[in-house]
């Protein structure tokens, strides 16, 4: 039978304080700083709204990381916090202990509450003070407003959740008294008229990461384009499932693509660009690449249709010479010359760490073109080549060229064509024999950290199975 540790005197005193309906600001003025976080959590979870209002006004830290607490269904408590902030923003004389400058609603703040909770349990507050997370400021608005509100916007439903609705309404009514700072914006499904009203409330200069994944057609993209051009500190842009409407003529398509790509001329901080299933890139990649103003660290173009001329323009783009990540998976290259890809790999050989060429349809006759350049990518730590129908001989040749890449930690290759029957079914006994042969040859050449071989996609579930050189079971 376990024996529960009795509550410490400080805990008992704090709980008694919360039960006091006549809690006064003068009482909080004398409350030890270390009691504020655990008591605030207690008040929030128990919906002690009047106590919350006063505790916000007397908060002894510059930052209030509220996001972990609003995961609890406590809209009433959340509103009480906003009411407390109202008092701070509108009253002329602030409480003596008032330090609050940042209301942090980003999804990265749980450590603050964990540290202070453990300190309360152990009675060791000195370590908690040492482990405080540094306040994240917004340099753009420093000194202009008394309060900055950090928020991450995930627009994933037709309507906003009740917390975000409550917050944005509150911000809208007090826009001259605070600064709303959004660094991460995800649009996963919402009518654009709703998105527009939210973007008008946010300082677009603050946004550093944008992800759009909601099957937009080009006419909708044109409505978003002007906002993109104002995100001058944008570092990461992810676009997925952008389609060309059948009602858009080739002339209209060219005009829309031009409007969109010219916005990149204003993005002087962009480092990561990812585009998945973006159909308007075909024949227009040069327009986008010519508007890039920075050297990219990450470039992902996946499951798109590109012309051979697009690949040529990519290999000639000056903004890709310092890439660390290159992902071209799902780009069909079967009937193309891979000389542009060879030139591209030569350009990024000094910096490239991650290369994904899955499902590009690369065949035996094409592989030799990229081998010399690939073998000079000495910083490469991950290489994936799954889904390309190559023979055993070509696979062995490929492995012999990657042998000198000493930083290579993870390698993924397709099961060679000899592993399959004429109807495309994997022959397990033959595959096991091939793996044994490959294991011997690879061990003779080097000691790889991890090599996996993958089968073709299952016609029933659509998934692949992965096997290492020795295991008989799947390594998924």
Swiss-Prot record:
Question: What is the scientific name of the source organism?
Answer: Homo sapiens
Tell me where on the tree of life, at the top rank, the source sits.
Eukaryota
Q: Which Gene3D superfamilies match?
A: Ribonuclease Inhibitor
* Function as written in the Swiss-Prot or TrEMBL entry: Substrate-recognition component of a Cul2-RING (CRL2) E3 ubiquitin-protein ligase complex, which mediates ubiquitination of target proteins, leading to their degradation. The CRL2(PRAMEF6) complex mediates ubiquitination and degradation of truncated MSRB1/SEPX1 selenoproteins produced by failed UGA/Sec decoding.
Q: What is this protein called?
A: PRAME family member 6
Assembly notes: Component of a CRL2 E3 ubiquitin-protein ligase complex, also named ECS (Elongin BC-CUL2/5-SOCS-box protein) complex, composed of CUL2, Elongin BC (ELOB and ELOC), RBX1 and substrate-specific adapter PRAMEF6.
**Record's Gene Ontology CC terms?**
Cul2-RING ubiquitin ligase complex; cytoplasm
The similarity comment for this entry is: Belongs to the PRAME family.
Question: By which gene is this protein encoded?
Answer: PRAMEF6
A GO biological process this protein is involved in? negative regulation of cell differentiation
Q: Name one GO molecular function term.
A: ubiquitin-like ligase-substrate adaptor activity
Q: In which pathway does it act?
A: Protein modification; protein ubiquitination
Which positions does the entry assign to LRR repeats? Answer: 97-124, 179-203, 204-230, 231-266, 267-292, 293-324, 325-345, 349-376, 377-401
Keywords assigned: Leucine-rich repeat, Repeat, Ubl conjugation pathway
């Amino acid at each position: 039978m376990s024996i529960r540790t009795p509550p410490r005197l400080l805990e008992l005193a704090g709980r008694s304080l919360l039960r006091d309906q006549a809690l006064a600001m003068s009482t909080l003025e004398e409350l030890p700083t270390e009691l504020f976080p655990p008591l605030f959590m207690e008040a929030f979870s128990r919906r002690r709204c009047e106590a919350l209002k006063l505790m916000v006004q007397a908060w002894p830290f510059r930052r209030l990381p509220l996001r972990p607490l609003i995961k609890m269904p406590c809209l009433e408590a959340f509103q009480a916090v906003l009411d407390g902030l109202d008092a701070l923003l509108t009253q002329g004389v602030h409480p003596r202990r008032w330090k609050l400058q940042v209301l942090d609603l980003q999804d990265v703040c749980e450590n603050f509450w964990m540290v202070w909770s453990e300190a309360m349990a152990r009675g060791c507050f000195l370590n908690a003070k040492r482990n405080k997370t540094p306040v994240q400021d917004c340099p753009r608005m420093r000194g202009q407003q008394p309060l900055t509100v950090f928020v991450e916007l995930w627009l994933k439903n037709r309507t906003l959740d009740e917390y975000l609705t409550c917050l944005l309404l509150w911000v809208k009514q007090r826009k001259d008294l605070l600064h709303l700072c959004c660094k991460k914006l995800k649009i996963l499904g919402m009518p654009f008229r709703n998105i527009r009203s939210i973007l008008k409330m946010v300082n677009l200069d603050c946004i550093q990461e944008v992800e759009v994944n909601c099957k937009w057609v080009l006419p909708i993209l044109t409505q978003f384009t002007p906002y993109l051009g104002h995100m001058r500190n944008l570092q990461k842009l992810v676009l997925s499932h952008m389609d060309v409407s059948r009602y858009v003529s080739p002339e209209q398509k060219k005009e829309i693509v031009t409007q969109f790509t010219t916005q990149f001329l204003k993005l002087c901080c962009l480092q990561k660009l990812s585009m998945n299933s973006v159909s308007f890139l075909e024949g227009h990649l040069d327009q986008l690449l010519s508007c890039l103003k920075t050297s990219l660290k990450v470039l992902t173009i996946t499951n798109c249709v590109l012309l051979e001329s697009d690949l040529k323009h990519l290999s000639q783009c000056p903004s890709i010479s310092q890439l660390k990540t290159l992902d071209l998976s799902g780009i069909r290259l079967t009937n193309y010359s891979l000389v542009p890809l060879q030139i591209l790999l030569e350009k990024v050989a000094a910096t490239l760490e991650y290369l994904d060429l899955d499902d590009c349809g690369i065949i035996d006759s094409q592989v030799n073109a990229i081998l010399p350049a690939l073998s000079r990518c000495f910083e490469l730590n991950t290489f994936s080549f799954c889904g390309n129908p190559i023979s055993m001989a070509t696979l062995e040749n490929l492995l012999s060229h990657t042998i000198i890449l000493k930083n290579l930690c993870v390698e993924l290759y397709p099961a060679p064509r000899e592993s399959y029957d004429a109807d495309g079914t994997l022959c397990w006994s033959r595959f096991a024999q091939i793996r044994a042969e490959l294991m011997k040859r690879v061990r003779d050449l080097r000691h790889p950290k991890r090599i996996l071989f993958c089968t073709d996609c299952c016609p029933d579930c659509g998934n692949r199975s992965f096997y290492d050189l020795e295991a008989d079971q799947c390594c998924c």
